[in-house]
Amino acid sequence: MLDVNFFDELRIGLATADDIRQWSHGEVKKPETINYRTLKPEKDGLFCEKIFGPTRDWECYCGKYKRVRFKGIICERCGVEVTRAKVRRERMGHIELAAPVTHIWYFKGVPSRLGYLLDLAPKDLEKVIYFAAYMVTWVDTEARERDLPSLEAQISVERQHLEQRRDSAIEERHRKLEADLAELEEQGAKADARRKVREAAEREIRQIRDRAQREIDRLEEVWNRFKNLKVQDLEGDEQLYREMRDRFGKYFRGGMGAQAIKERLANFDLEAEAEKLREIIRTGKGQKKARALKRLKVVSAFLNTRNSPMGMVLDCVPVIPPDLRPMVQLDGGRFATSDLNDLYRRVINRNNRLKRLLDLGAPEIIVNNEKRMLQEAVDALFDNGRRGRPVTGPGNRPLKSLSDMLKGKQGRFRQNLLGKRVDYSGRSVIVVGPQLKLHQCGLPKQMALELFKPFVMKRLVDLNHAQNIKSAKRMVERARPVVWDVLEEVISEHPVLLNRAPTLHRLGIQAFEPQLVEGKAIQIHPLVCTAFNADFDGDQMAVHLPLSAEAQAEARILMLATNNILKPSDGKPVTMPTQDMVIGLYYLTTMKEGAKGEGRAFSNIGEAIMAYDLGELDLQAKIKLRVEGDTVPPVNWEPPEDYQPGQPYILETTLGRYLFNETTPEDYPFVNQQMGKKQLSALVTELAEKYSKVQVATTLDALKDAGYYWATRSGLTISISDVIPPPNKQQILDKYEQQAQKIQRQYERGLISDDERRQELIHIWTKATDEVAKDMEENSPPDNPVWMMVNSGSRGNPLQVRQIAAIRGLVSNTKGETIPRPIKSSYREGLTVLEYFISTHGQRKGLADTALRTADSGYLTRRLVDVAQDVIVREVDCGTDRFLWQEIGERRPDGTIVRKHNVENTGFGRTLAEDVVVDGKVIATKLSDTTEALIDKLLAAGVTRIRIRSALVCESKIGVCATCYGRSLATGKPVDVGEAVGIIAAQSIGEPGTQLTMRTFHMGGTAGQDITHGLPRVQELFEARVPKGVAPISEVEGRVRIEETDKSRKIIVVPDDGSDEVSYQVPMRAPLLVQDGQRVEVGQQLVQGTVNPHEILRILGPRAVQQHLVSEVQEVYKSQGVSIHDKHIEIIVRQMLKRVNVLESGDTKLLPGEMIERPKFEEINRRVVAEGGQPASARPVLLGITKASLATESWLSAASFQETTRVLTENAIHGKSDPLLGLKENVIIGKLIPAGTGMPQYRNIRVEPTEEAKASMYSVSSYEEPSEYTFGQGSGEAVPLEDYDFGSYNR
């Protein structure tokens, strides 16, 4: 077999008949599968052992040769080679067809490649292939021209002959009529009888005339058709064709079916055709030019590759190996078989019947029908259902053809190549393990024993607890006591991977050190739940075991939970104390007025703890405490006058706060404040930035332990009586009810419109709700458990408390519009029937939304991953001098400079493109990382915008460079070469997708257009779709004139430079953003609404469209409170703008209208210019992520994404080769991915031994030393035991 590591690219092309025969190990001649009695394969059938290899290892069909010692012998009785049975997975066969057939992909795909090549409409092509019309394949024009006069003479002679025959027949009839009439006259018949005879004669004469005329017309028709006959003419009239062939058969040839197509292809002159098409493109216009371009693409594909167009017509069909289309016996003695076997059987049956008919010399019409059926059978085998009705199996189920095997989620690509089942894995329900350290997980004993079985068995043998592997296995299966001790030993320091589906981002798989636990549930650390999005209501998780030392090292260094504290999407910590822990720490750090022991002073912490233990001091009482000098004072602490650092000092604090500070690192300043969720978040962020991973993990564990400990002791409970309703609710509502009635009266009098009434009512009731909520908050005691939860941030928010305690407020209906009457009851009071009904309405919609959203969001992630999967950091610096301007601050009206609100997602973690110089002094040097500190320093120096590097300006040929990408947000350090930043970007954008809304909001009632928000808006942007209700932007600089008629409204821009004015038709109701007479810039938006990104690209260029897309996507995520760094969106946008569309081809081989990647285009141009030619011109195009994924250089990646058959057809014709640069391609063929430790520069490292090592290696071993070769000769490859040959040992 081919070793996957020894090739760098993979080419796809068209197989010729010779290729197919070369792959084949024999011809399949019979449709039989296996013998019903012996259950052995039939000879020459679809499972034949002679062709495909033996069904059992080292055993021929007849049983003459058994055992491995006969390896390679071909049995003379049955012709089967003695070898391994697994060759039945790789040996192919073939079927020699009695008549050629066309390949359905190339004839039926859109566009039809065969049709483009031969310049035939697919309808006509179908007529020829399926024997409904004849096609002329060759005309001897010279001979025809030469013999035309003599042929014409022959025809005219024949015509005269026909005319003479007609005239004599008519004359004959006339004579007979005369005789008949004379006879009747003699007999004295009546006039009536005479009239009848005369009429009959006239009728016959008319018939003679008509018949003759028809013959003459037919002759004329045949002659005219022949005179103008040219290659590729179709003739559907069989009679006419036959007559033409009988008369002028030596001047032309024609045929039906694939044979005719094959002849046509054999004589097809590609070069001449290409020249002709280029001429049309140079001179032609419109439709004609467009068609010529499309045809030239196909023609030049065959010209420039090794493919022959003959490959589109097959003389033989390959038969895939039998183990890939197996036949298995079910319990009931019946057989289950792959659909392919049925499809192959139909092909073989029809092929054999056709052979027999040809041998018998059957009439042409019968043979043609059989040929058509053979063509249809092969079509069904390749792609069932592509043409006509699909072939169905039992129960009217369409059979799965070869194409279906590749397509879709269940196809070969997505089911078996990109995702595989993993050995050494298990899954179980998860429960919380509060006693675990951050890097640990609890693994059930039974599960651990099964996972680590081989390790335990080996260790048992090493420790002499078992004699051999077999007895060790028995010991493990019987779970002897010694086994558990060995398991403990084996398991220590051996990390396992835990994964929770759906794995939306890379934190969905993390490594932990297993701890053995009783029971059957996996225990996980409470702090990693956020990353996994896990809860303990029945979630399950999977465990995987890294086997090799390298895998264990990578799991420990890169994937251990303690190394994954920051979120890759925005660099914020993801392991945060939540819920119980927050409430415990909040309780611990609260300072309570008038608590027991308030105002006392303690000389050291021991005294305070003793007082607490004796019940003399409350945990939350305000005390004075003498603190040792090695404790860093609080940040804003003002020291006494003669204070020296290192001296003890006195702090006003509580015992609880001191205990809280025991959890933080030694040198962290004393925290003397109440710690809620926000404060804890800030604390963890600071720790992650300034301290080592070990210290952060220790602190987090200490915080977790303290949180649970004090949450337990806080005695926090909740009951309905803790929900305190606001005392003045009724008075407030009455006051606003009067205002509402006033508005209603104004409306009834017609003073305001319905729209205004709605707006006013909504405004009034919003104010009322807010006032009731305020009243509620003012009347809630600080130690109220419900409010403690809300204020600490551990659970719930004021809105929810408001709905339970005070007032439900305004709700929306199913359309998403707000209903202008509020729900005045709270949940505590209970809702009336009407209130209940209108509130369930909106909530039900919300639930339905969530279900749809999950699917949509998953598909978006899949497309994003696909478009960005080959963006890997490939080099340290691409050396570009391009940059982006990034705002980091804004000037207030009073002159002070403040930070821009979202700097942490725009300017933070970037690389400076230039030195920042203020007043001749360099504040920040080029290529430095913009940290929080540096941004503050720049703002202090009065700098509000900086030049940064970004993925959008990176000039790396493949992937991006580390400098342009900047800091890796997951580690807080500069990104490493080999980081798969494209995948991280896709995950960061896709993971919060489920949190986005689905709705289209309505702007105030009926008027105004709908604005797309949430997930649909993100999809619209990434797919580069033209939005609904698109707003025009000005193409020129100038003044605006607005013209309105009754029906329409126009905005006209009069350019300053006096060129033609540009007019834009806008909807009557659309709100304008410009006034009459206003000056507008190029690219300024004229109407409210969404802008078409393609227009921005056309008018303002790539940079503007990049910034538009990034900011618009950010808008959606920001509105939902999701924080994502710009660099992730920039990577996706970079992929969307990677290609250019060729306008003029110059002297290059490119075709106008062709899409090509920019670096490749520039390189082609450079080459042509160097040779003194004319370069090509192109314009940038914006592709949606689906289109961009399908347009990738890698055909493997595109085929495994969507439209598999189309991608493979297209790329096979162009003979594309896949450079294997992305991740997917390498996963598919089973190579190491070129990212992370799989990068070549990390793989190609050799460790040189030291001099001593070399010396000891080359020294001669003395006889006491064991010999080096204790094992037999052979490779160091592991041999599976069941395959190992133990000589004559009879298994």
UniProtKB/Swiss-Prot annotation:
UniProt-recorded name of the protein: DNA-directed RNA polymerase subunit beta'
GO cellular component, one term: DNA-directed RNA polymerase complex
Gene: rpoC
Annotated binding of Zn(2+) 1, by residue: 60, 62, 75, 78
Family, per entry: Belongs to the RNA polymerase beta' chain family.
PANTHER family noted in UniProt: DNA-DIRECTED RNA POLYMERASE (PTHR19376), DNA-DIRECTED RNA POLYMERASE SUBUNIT BETA (PTHR19376:SF54)
Gene3D superfamilies: 1.10.132.30, 1.10.150.390, 1.10.1790.20, 1.10.40.90, 2.40.40.20, 2.40.50.100, RNA polymerase II, clamp domain (4.10.860.120), RNA polymerase Rpb1, domain 3 (1.10.274.100)
Function: DNA-dependent RNA polymerase catalyzes the transcription of DNA into RNA using the four ribonucleoside triphosphates as substrates.
Keyword vocabulary terms for this entry: DNA-directed RNA polymerase, Magnesium, Metal-binding, Nucleotidyltransferase, Transcription, Transferase, Zinc
UniProt cross-references to InterPro entries, sorted A to Z: DNA-dir_RpoC_beta_prime, DNA-dir_RpoC_beta_prime_bact, RNA_pol_asu, RNA_pol_N, RNA_pol_Rpb1_1, RNA_pol_Rpb1_3, RNA_pol_Rpb1_3_sf, RNA_pol_Rpb1_4
Residues annotated for Mg(2+) binding in this entry: 535, 537, 539
Binding of Zn(2+) 2, residues: 878, 954, 961, 964
HAMAP family, alphabetized: RNApol_bact_RpoC
One of the protein's GO biological processes: DNA-templated transcription
GO molecular function term, any single one: DNA-directed RNA polymerase activity
Catalytic activity: RNA(n) + a ribonucleoside 5'-triphosphate = RNA(n+1) + diphosphate
Cofactor: Mg(2+); Zn(2+)
Comment on bound cofactor: Binds 1 Mg(2+) ion per subunit.
Highest taxon listed in the record's lineage: Bacteria
Pfam families named in the record: RNA_pol_Rpb1_1 (PF04997), RNA_pol_Rpb1_2 (PF00623), RNA_pol_Rpb1_3 (PF04983), RNA_pol_Rpb1_4 (PF05000), RNA_pol_Rpb1_5 (PF04998)
Subunit structure: The RNAP catalytic core consists of 2 alpha, 1 beta, 1 beta' and 1 omega subunit. When a sigma factor is associated with the core the holoenzyme is formed, which can initiate transcription.
Protein's UniProt keywords contain Oxidoreductase: no
Entry EC number(s): 2.7.7.6
